[in-house]
């Protein structure tokens, strides 16, 4: 056996020696100029680009068969600048044809290539000759068919300029492998590159490369994965008059806000825009994308429907979506009407830049909607944003136990927001409605509220200071907390100067009517009437929206069988959330048989101030200062009158 192996090994060794000697001889005898020219001709024939070599050329046949060109440029015939610069372009050769003095490229390797893509306004680019040539040479039966089927790129850069859209991009540190097997019509590219500071893994495969290069329909699969964003497409592509793609599109990101910033888009101001996922059937024509069978998730909100996006000079997004539940709390979490921990309006300036970036036309419907503390039932609304003007319309929303409908608009004028709101609340719970919308916690019952307001300002305080419009409220079967009008009036009817705390209890009402007119941030009462089982209240005066304070006067009346038996003027002053309510002291004094003569008797200022001080202790409230009186002093009150006043107390 060993002897047989020896006999077999000798011929093999001789054969290998002959091959080695032949290769060595070939490497010395081969015409290197002819080899270089053949390689240059093949590259020119395949790419359609002129090859210019400024550096040295290395030729090796054994042990490696290759030709390396240093400082290479490739450009179209009419182009002034090369479309491709390469530090080292290496063409690896096929061994067997080389032994027969035929020079065929097996693959190309580019070290540190600098790729320049310039797209003109007419859609053509400096790479159009390459695409046309390679499409022609890859067709079956072509005269100059592609001899190599793989290109590798190492440490490359790509500069892209789009004259039509005035855009430019740059890819760096490109490591890429492109392959189109000769036994197949397919094309594949896999690799990595850096874009805007992030490493991107990408792959693309085309089922019919020749058809795709010719603009005909071909299968396409593409994947891009990076830290900010993941994207995948599986479908078909064609490019006759414009690029067309149809297939399944999936997008996923942990933060849509970060992904938008990474791609050069300005995210909306405020909060939200975190976790985002989309899967849809996509139809792409040019710069427009139509999405059907959409399943989209944003910040935990899941919806279905259709969407379209276009970027013909200005970004436009249209959508019709339906959801089971929507939560808009994240998007208003950074918006504050009131200053933190204070009763004053927030003076922080609005950020209106997001109104200018995108046009929006969206229709949403949901079974449940949450906006901060507000819970809505079935709701249908639309949002339209065009040329910096935002319009929100609510077709119908179940809220506060009733129905709401109306519109809200914001238009930008430099740094000023012009706001217009028109809303109707029908048969709503007033306690929840007044508390959440206006910060008023003293009203309960059910009613209808109509609001029509306009304002302009650069902050919530600016809006409050310029508020104009009207508001009307009609309510029934409720109560106003803070004081009990009926009990107070009955007590004061018996003892006008009796003291005690009047800021307790609540006043029930059968009907409540409020009509207000706003002008420059001041609300003036046109009609305020409260009708209860045994009392009636009317109010006149103003309320300042910027300072959030009341300045009202009213009359409370006891009623019996429709007739008025006792009336008490009173005053409402102070902040909205904690107003001071007290009866008019002068009216109480006049109603008391014991002290009525005092008010008429006291004429000089010192005596009047002394009496008023005593009366304040009786009433528990303050006496509003009157105009100075210069009349002659009156005689002091009689001892009997003073004794009667003490008994009343």
Which functions belong to the PLM regions below?
Residues 1-48:
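N-terminal type II signal-anchor transmembrane helix
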Residues 2-13, 281-287, 294-297, 301, ...:
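Extended terminal
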Residues 49, 66, 70-178, 195, ...:
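Secondary-structure transition motifs
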Residues 105, 190, 244-248, 296, ...:
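Glycine-rich, small/hydroxylated-residue low-complexity segments
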Residues 113-114, 131-245, 346-381, 385:
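Elongated, acidic membrane-bridging lipid-handling scaffolds
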């Amino acid at each position: 056996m060993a002897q047989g192996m020896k006999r077999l090994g000798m011929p093999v060794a001789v054969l290998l020696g002959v091959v080695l000697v032949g290769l060595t001889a070939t490497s010395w005898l081969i015409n290197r100029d002819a080899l270089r020219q053949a390689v240059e001709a093949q590259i020119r024939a395949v790419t359609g680009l002129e090859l210019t070599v400024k550096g040295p050329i290395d030729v090796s046949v054994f042990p490696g068969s290759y030709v390396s060109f240093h400082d290479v440029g490739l450009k179209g015939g009419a182009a002034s600048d090369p479309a491709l610069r390469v530090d080292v372009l290496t063409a690896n050769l096929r061994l067997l044809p080389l032994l027969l003095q035929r020079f065929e490229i097996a693959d190309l390797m580019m070290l540190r290539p600098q790729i320049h893509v310039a797209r003109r306004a007419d859609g053509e680019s400096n790479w159009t000759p390459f695409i046309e040539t390679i499409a022609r040479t890859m067709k079956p039966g072509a005269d100059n068919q592609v001899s190599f089927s793989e290109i590798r790129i190492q440490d490359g850069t790509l500069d892209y300029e789009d004259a039509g859209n005035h855009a430019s991009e740059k890819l760096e540190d490109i490591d890429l492998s492109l392959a189109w097997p000769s036994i197949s019509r397919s094309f594949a590219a896999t690799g990595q590159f850096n874009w805007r500071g992030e490493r991107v893994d990408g792959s693309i495969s085309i089922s019919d490369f020749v058809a795709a290069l010719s603009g005909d329909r071909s299968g396409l699969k593409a994947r891009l994965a990076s830290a900010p964003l993941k994207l995948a497409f599986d479908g078909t592509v064609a490019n006759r008059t414009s690029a067309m793609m149809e297939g399944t599109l999936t997008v996923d990101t942990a933060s849509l806000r970060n992904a938008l910033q990474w791609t050069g888009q300005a995210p909306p101001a405020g909060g939200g825009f975190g976790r985002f996922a989309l899967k849809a059937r996509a139809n792409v024509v040019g710069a427009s994308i139509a999405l059907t069978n959409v399943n989209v998730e944003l910040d935990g909100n899941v919806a279905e429907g259709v969407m379209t996006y276009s970027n013909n000079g200005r970004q436009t997004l249209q959508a019709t979506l339906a959801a089971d539940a929507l939560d808009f709390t994240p998007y208003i979490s950074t918006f504050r009407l009131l200053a933190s921990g204070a009763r004053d309006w927030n003076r922080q300036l609005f950020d209106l830049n997001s109104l200018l970036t995108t046009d929006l036309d969206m229709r949403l419907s949901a079974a449940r909607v949450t906006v901060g503390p507000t819970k809505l039932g079935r709701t249908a609304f639309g949002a339209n944003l065009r040329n910096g003007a935002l319009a929100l319309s609510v077709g119908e929303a179940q809220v506060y136990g009733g129905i709401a409908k109306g519109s809200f608009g914001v238009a930008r004028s430099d740094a000023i927001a012009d706001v217009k709101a028109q809303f109707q609340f029908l048969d709503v719970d007033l306690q929840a409605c007044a508390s959440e919308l206006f910060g008023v916690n003293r009203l309960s019952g059910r009613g209808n509220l109509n609001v029509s307001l306009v304002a302009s300002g650069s902050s919530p305080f600016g809006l409050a200071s310029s508020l104009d419009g009207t508001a009307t409220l009609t309510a029934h079967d409720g109560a106003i907390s803070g004081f009990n009008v009926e009990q107070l009036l009955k007590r004061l009817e018996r003892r006008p100067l009796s003291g005690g705390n009047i800021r307790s209890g609540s006043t029930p009402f059968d009907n409540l009517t409020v009509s207000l007119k706003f002008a420059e941030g001041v609300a003036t009462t046109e009609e305020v009437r409260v009708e209860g089982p045994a009392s009636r209240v009317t109010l006149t005066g103003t309320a300042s929206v910027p300072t959030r304070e009341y300045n009202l006067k009213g009359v409370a009346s006891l009623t019996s069988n429709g007739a008025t038996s006792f009336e008490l003027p009173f005053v409402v002053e102070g902040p909205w959330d904690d107003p001071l309510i007290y009866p008019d002291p002068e009216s109480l004094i006049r109603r008391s048989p014991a002290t009525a003569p005092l008010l008429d008797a006291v004429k000089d200022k010192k005596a009047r101030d002394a009496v008023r001080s005593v009366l304040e202790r009786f009433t528990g409230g303050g006496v509003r200062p009157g105009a100075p009186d210069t009349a002659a002093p009156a005689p002091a009150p009689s001892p009997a009158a003073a004794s009667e006043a003490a008994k009343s107390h």
